[in-house]
Amino acid sequence: MDYKTAGVNIALADSLINKISSKSDQIGKFAANFTLDKKLNRDLVASCDGVGTKILLALEAKRKYNRSLKSIGQDCVAMVINDILCENAEPLFFMDYLSTSKLNESDYLEIIQGIQDACEYVNIPLIGGETAELPGMFTEGSVDVCGFAVGTKHFLDFSKVELGDLVIGIHSTGVHSNGFSLVRKLLIEYPVCDEHMEQLLEPTQLYHNHIKMLRSNFVDIKAIAHITGGGFSNINRVLSKLVTIQYYDADPFYEHEEIFKWIQNKSQLSNIEMQNTFNCGIGMMVVIPATRLKDIPFSDYSVLGKIIPCS
């Protein structure tokens, strides 16, 4: 079973994006840039994203064994803020959008608390949002959660990516927030225990502090890619078409091997298909000079490979 069989057609989505790309030169980026003041070189960066069908699994876990939905709030914030980091920006504030057929007080308060906690973690305010009851548009008990954020660009641009630069992968906390349309299809046929369900629902890592630590240690960041839908191929969105990555390890899994191997075994996806669908243990890729590897101030990363010319 592949992602398309599960109901998600990435190739079609890419094709549609190409068709509308003439409408804006911002399409295809992790977040959109807006020049606020050309003279002062002040740019804003904005992003919008959601948690996707992971919410359905989280709702099921709450109904089954009273698992809190706070983690979904963190997922929402992380999906947006991690994208803003890829555009060399510092987040300023966050807004949420929650829609449902009928409001459930417990669900609502838990999700909002998770959003607030995640905003506090990255030191930004939750300044508002929208809550919509939409009877007839959702099945009973369903919820959709999206987020919006604005950041300000750092004054110093990323340095140019060069041949020989290293690509490091900062580890994920698990599956994060993509691939769940496929995961949910698998769970219908192959139910898992509560422990494995908890692993699947582990909230998306917020990488704000990792990037902040790299900057504080004067590590020259050349490019950042958030590994979500599209998996490892997302790094191509921030690289020139003249270069590519030579990966050091043929093994597709870097962390959380048990849960990703379970997905692969049950879905029969190839290694390449897995890396183009799931994060496989890497939630964010960062390109740095090889000489600065020793200056990375945290340990939860792997050296994935180096930048080489396209053949």
Region roles according to the model:
Residues 158-159, 178-182:
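A short secondary-structure junction signal
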Residues 72-79, 203-206, 255:
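Short secondary-structure boundary/capping elements
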Residues 52, 150-154, 173-175, 229-230, ...:
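Short, glycine-/Ser/Thr-/acidic-enriched flexible segments
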Residues 13:
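Active-site loop/lid in soluble adenylation, ligation, and acyl-transfer enzymes
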Residues 180-191:
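Short, compositionally biased
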Residues 2-7, 16, 22, 65, ...:
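Glycine-/charge-enriched secondary-structure boundary and capping motifs
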Residues 20-173:
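Glycine-rich phosphate/pyrophosphate-binding loop regions near the starts of catalytic domains
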